[in-house]
Amino acid sequence: MERDERPPSGGGGGGGSAGFLEPPAALPPPPRNGFCQDELAELDPSTISVPDDRAEQRTCLICGDRATGLHYGIISCEGCKGFFKRSICNKRVYRCSRDKNCVMSRKQRNRCQYCRLLKCLQMGMNRKAIREDGMPGGRNKSIGPVQISEEEIERIMSGQEFEEEANHWSNHGDSDHSSPGNRASESNQPSPGSTLSSRSVELNGFMAFRDQYMGMSVPPHYQYIPHLFSYSAHSPLLPPQARSLDPQSYSLIHQLVSAEDLEPLGTPMLIEDGYAVTQAELFALLCRLADELLFRQIAWIKKLPFFCELSIKDYTCLLSSTWQELILLSSLTVYSKQIFGELADVTAKYSPSDEELHRFSDEGMEVIERLIYLYHKFHQLKVSNEEYACMKAINFLNQDIRGLTSASQLEQLNKRYWYICQDFTEYKYTHQPNRFPDLMMCLPEIRYIAGKMVNVPLEQLPLLFKVVLHSCKTSVGKE
């Protein structure tokens, strides 16, 4: 996209944009009433059918044996399902006599219980989906895999987590009638105050961004991907087989990609040589970027192939709960060259004060570490536009959000694009059998980071972005 190369005239106006080179045209005006419901209603996309469920054999994500279904959040066999349930119900603490990296296969899975349980946790088995009495019929059947930190996995493997839970319940008795699983499920829902039906969205400048930002609720440590029905990982003993892409899957993916605005961002990020960017100017630029990215998400909704299948109220509710995640996902993928290129050049011209460095929060440090990790993960995967479009739709179609009127319809849509994404990755990346689960496990990390950013004070965002962009750009430049 061409930019006006004329030097900025006059002083820095109210937007704090002195020194930045303006584009030839301003961004389109924001909608006046939430998501422009009149414009949304005028669209009439064609109705599409749901592809038939595939009956091909699935393999257990833990050992590669024949899977029998979705157990505690992931596709697994009866053996690993029972082992995980017994280990959690009986609070087992195992030991590995080797290096804690034993091979897991159908024949070798019983040789090391420690490594088997470790892999169950790493692949996303949800221990909170097991009933406390150990009887069949676990809690939270709609919840998919969970992603927990290495520290929490270590607490579970060492037994420390079991001891802490026992102490908690002994101290609280029956004062809390909800189970841990129920509390986790409830806390995963956005607060009623975060829905756009109770507060109209304005996209102009800092005030709206701040109100939206501060109004979001923080997700719990466990972040769920709803309805992980079908991702499969091939055992090393079961090499992937050649397959063809279903024509209907290709058509639906093409429609998803067509709904995306893949043009470069229009927010000016060029800056005069030698110009020293202030904290206020960098913050104003970040707000303008957020405004443009959010506007693109609204335009994206109106172009979705399934637009006519949901109500405007549900779209409003979905976007109010996922907009931060959508912006983060797009910044790490389709707009990463600009964000980690042009924006990184701007942040390099910002020098934080000693006071800013001293007051930087622990929450900010955690966000920095996770963002850098996630950037390298996406950089390694080299996510295609097709995969990005599917990941975005899957993350957006979260039927566990409070206030929805068509949760069952959302479940079917989520399932549809889950299968489509798996079809595409297994077809295009035949020799990367773990690519699809690798992509899907990035989604709970995105949700976690987006939720954690709520705890970072707004005045610390310029420093946070400077550190992340500098670290990522420097490390990639060395490759």
From Swiss-Prot:
Q: Where is this region: Sufficient for interaction with UIMC1?
A: 172-252
What is the disulfide pattern of this chain? none
- Zn finger (NR C4-type) ranges are 60-80, 96-120
Keywords (alphabetical) are: Developmental protein, Differentiation, DNA-binding, Metal-binding, Nucleus, Receptor, Spermatogenesis, Transcription, Transcription regulation, Zinc, Zinc-finger
Q: Which InterPro entries match?
A: NHR-like_dom_sf (IPR035500), Nucl_hrmn_rcpt_lig-bd (IPR000536), Nuclear_hormone_rcpt_NR3 (IPR050200), Nuclear_hrmn_rcpt (IPR001723), Znf_hrmn_rcpt (IPR001628), Znf_NHR/GATA (IPR013088)
Cellular component GO terms, alphabetically? chromatin; nucleus
Chief location of this protein within or outside the cell: nucleus
Regions of biased composition (Polar residues) lie at 178-198
Residues reported to bind Zn(2+) 2: C96, C102, C112, C115
Recorded GO molecular functions are: estrogen response element binding; nuclear receptor activity; zinc ion binding
Give TM segment ranges. Answer: none
**Domain of life of the organism in this record?**
Eukaryota
Compositional bias (Gly residues): 9-18
* Residue positions binding Zn(2+) 1: C60, C63, C77, C80
- Which residues mediate DNA binding here? 57-132
Q: Where is the NR LBD domain?
A: 248-479
Know the name of this protein?
Nuclear receptor subfamily 6 group A member 1
Question: What is the species listed in this Swiss-Prot or TrEMBL entry?
Answer: Sus scrofa (Pig)
